[in-house]
Amino acid sequence: MKKTFLPIFLVILLASYALGNPQITFSKDWRPGKK
């Protein structure tokens, strides 16, 4: 149950974070861990 819930939770969390920070763009300059 949790194995299927966790990825969905992460996607929702990431989406809400992106919506809360409109200046963040997922361009070629964006990489995991880069701020």
From Swiss-Prot:
Keywords: Amidation, G-protein coupled receptor impairing toxin, Pyrrolidone carboxylic acid, Secreted, Signal, Toxin. Expressed by the venom secretory cell of the spine. The spine is a cuticular structure containing a single large nucleated venom-secreting cell at its base. It is an independent unit capable of producing, storing and injecting venom. On the back of D.vulnerans caterpillars, spines are grouped together by 50 to 100 to form scoli, of which there are eight in D.vulnerans. The modification Pyrrolidone carboxylic acid is found at residue 23. Residues 1-22 form the signal peptide. It comes from the Eukaryota. It is found in: Secreted. GO terms for molecular function: toxin activity. Extremely abundant peptide in the venom (almost one-quarter of all toxin-encoding transcripts, and the highest represented peptide by proteomics methods). Belongs to the limacoditoxin-1 (ACP-like) family. Potently activates insect GPCR. More precisely, it activates the ACP receptor (ACPR) from the mosquito A.aegypti (EC(50)=3.07 nM) with a potency comparable to that of the endogenous ligand. Has no activity on receptors of the closely related neuropeptides adipokinetic hormone and corazonin. In vivo, does not reveal any observable effects when injected into crickets (A.domesticus). Does not induce increase in intracellular calcium in mouse DRG neurons, suggesting that it does not induce pain. This is Z-limacoditoxin(1)-Dv4.
